[in-house]
Amino acid sequence: MIGLVGKKVGMTRIFTEEGVSIPVTVIEVEANRVTQVKDLANDGYRAVQVTTGAKKANRVTKPEAGHFAKAGVEAGRGLWEFRLADGEEYTVGQSISVELFAEVKKVDVTGTSKGKGFAGTVKRWNFRTQDATHGNSLSHRVPGSIGQNQTPGKVFKGKKMAGQLGNERVTVQSLDVVRVDAERNLLLVKGAVPGATGSDLIVKPAVKA
């Protein structure tokens, strides 16, 4: 089963009949329009390419305009691709709604996390801070030793150090689907998802469900 592309609206909460509060993220999943269907003969694999939303005409490049025109769909804000399982069939120009998830219990949500800029090891990797007093001079939040010895005489790759934090692709797995509102194109999932309000999200049926 393929996934869909949506937009993060924000977080709220809903109550069950027993009065239990459930924190939910609201994802707006407008109709995903099929722009291309890839097959084994031409592309070496089976996949469906979709777009969603809209883009100003003066923002659409000529190659993009030709691609959308060939598919006979309105230019969207991007292009995304999902691999097709055996037996799944879609046609170019087809519209796929949030009702795709009507029978799905859990989903995986992929997005781009909020960028935090250049961060130190305490914020980025949860390092302990060093002594606040007792002879500590200007080394309260420094990482400490990062090296080895004359052998191997280098810092190993992957060493946790200061650097860019956030603004990377993140997937949160197995979130419960709380509600599917096909009338308003909304999907409510339990818990938080990556990214800022208004950012694009890829929602797929959970691989570990």
From Swiss-Prot:
Post-translational modification: Methylated by PrmB.
GO MF annotation: an example: rRNA binding
Domain of life: Bacteria
A Pfam family assignment: Ribosomal_L3
Keywords assigned by UniProt, alphabetized: Methylation, Ribonucleoprotein, Ribosomal protein, RNA-binding, rRNA-binding
Positions where N5-methylglutamine occurs in the chain: 150
Record carries keyword Protein biosynthesis: no
One annotated Gene Ontology cellular component of this protein: cytosolic large ribosomal subunit
GO biological process, any: translation
Task performed by this protein: One of the primary rRNA binding proteins, it binds directly near the 3'-end of the 23S rRNA, where it nucleates assembly of the 50S subunit.
NCBIfam families: L3_bact
Family assignment from sequence similarity: Belongs to the universal ribosomal protein uL3 family.
HAMAP family: Ribosomal_uL3_B
Subunit structure: Part of the 50S ribosomal subunit. Forms a cluster with proteins L14 and L19.
Protein name stated in the entry: Large ribosomal subunit protein uL3
Species this chain originates from: Cronobacter sakazakii (strain ATCC BAA-894) (Enterobacter sakazakii)
